[in-house]
Amino acid sequence: MDNYTRAYVLGKLRFKAPKEIDYDELKTGINNLNATQNFSRISYSLEPKDNGNELKINLSENENKTFLKFGLHYDGLYKSAILVNVTHKKSMFKNDVLSMDLALGDNIRYNLDYYIDNGFYWSFGIKSRFNEFNRNVKTDFNDGTLFEQTGLNSLNMDFSDLTNQIYVQTVFIQKYLIGAGLEHKYLRIETENLEENSRVFENSTYISAFGYLKYDSFDNRYFPKNGWLFSGDIQSFLYSSDYTKEFDRFSIAKGEIGFAKNFAKKWTLKIQSEAGFSFGNESVDFFDFVLGGYGNQTINNFKHFLGYDFLIISGDSFIK
């Protein structure tokens, strides 16, 4: 291969040689390899050997390196936007991918990802994103104290979040994704509902360290019929420029677990739950768990909760 390493291919197949595998493992590995869209042709053969069959895989690399996509988006939080995605492969190294998502509309957003995929070896990534929105919310990020003092029951809030991450991750025992990294975050929250000297709630920079573990055997991302899902991460906030003069070091743990089982041709049972809590010193209210709304992507500790409006329930712990 000219543009991909052996470690990259084995990482996508999720098995190492020499190893005995069954047909389901082979099928899953080939599907994973095909999903990368890095190969225009994938074929394999089994050649008899003294102690079994030897698997040989033939790959034809896709010559396309750059992809441009457009889309339209609307939700109740970010409103309408034109979406632009640019993805370029092999920018500097054989196994790297650079992706840029840009949302142009009522609230400008971007998401930048650069990832060097080394398969079963340690892989390296850089992420940067910016999110902003304006919305009437029924949380004051202060346990309701501000609402009690002012007599208000909602705030028109301008929210801005710039987050940058560097991280490493690998596949452990060919099943579990583990990783760790450092995060820089700039957070600004303000409102026009209050007096001039009280309009800015937050205007701080934060430095934190994080680690995570993920396992996903669902056979379909959105409508699984069989499999398990587990995801857990811990983030420790180590430093803040401390605009509010209330910062102490603290940590946040979050987890998600799910199970799906197909019982009949058209019947599947799916059970899923997630929870989170803070520990250590008293947490910063702006990193509380805030539930409500819908969508595919979330930031910070915002969590979807169908049946409730966006950003309507908040607390330093939750389970659903």
PLM regions with names:
Residues 15, 53-55, 202, 248, ...:
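Hydrophobic transmembrane signal anchors and adjacent membrane-proximal interface regions, especially
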Residues 1-22, 175-176:
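Acidic, glycine-rich low-complexity/disordered segments
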Residues 70-72, 206-214, 218-320:
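C-terminal outer-membrane beta-barrel translocator/porin domains of Gram-negative envelope proteins
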